[in-house]
């Protein structure tokens, strides 16, 4: 990232229709606009012309670029694949809660428009194999393949912002320590109510707390760029390259983070989907990260 990009026009834009709950000290001003073409060479760039994904329960000698499990509780644990209270992250190699034959549901597909994650409602028999979850969906992470301390992270996505019960997310979590010991950045997530939620979760005060910003979403299923600029002093959230809000960087944000893309369905926050719904999708055209200028 070139220094001049971050040193021009530092005046902060107020969140566009947003609501802010920030920490005790105000964050330093961030650039109102970020243009990816001016950021220099990225540290990570994925356009999904190939989809290098696999389970990678533990770190292999040659990790896949995208990991399809969370790594919580071991390979046979529900927590290893849980996305929400109603949905489980599966892949073509998932053998079910009974560790039997492959369940046979692949939520991932690629094409000219990048990666599509499709959540599917399953029948009662399949629910048993999904630890009781009603929906089979997907999640991918860069754990083992990419992590970074500070920088600008961006995903170009088509999200079901206004589809009831849909819970897609692009987020960052630390590579070390139990969640959320060193924080979590949601950049962003949506829950089907037409809003976009940007959140920094922290335990810097010895308890789980969050700095939260809400902005309007787009219900037309168009492509948008969702980004987060993470600096030692400030975190800024960007929608199509424009700053929509910022918060102070919590003191416990000291470890490199890796990226997660997932599509949850239902749960206590978004609520259940429409009973008639059988399929929900999110599309991701590009995921890119740049380091901070030295």
Describe the residue ranges of each PLM region:
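GH16 jelly-roll
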Residues: 23-294
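Boundary at the C-terminal end of the N-terminal hydrophobic targeting segment
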Residues: 18-22
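Bacterial N-terminal signal peptides that target proteins for export
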Residues: 1-7
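Bacterial N-terminal signal peptides
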Residues: 8-15
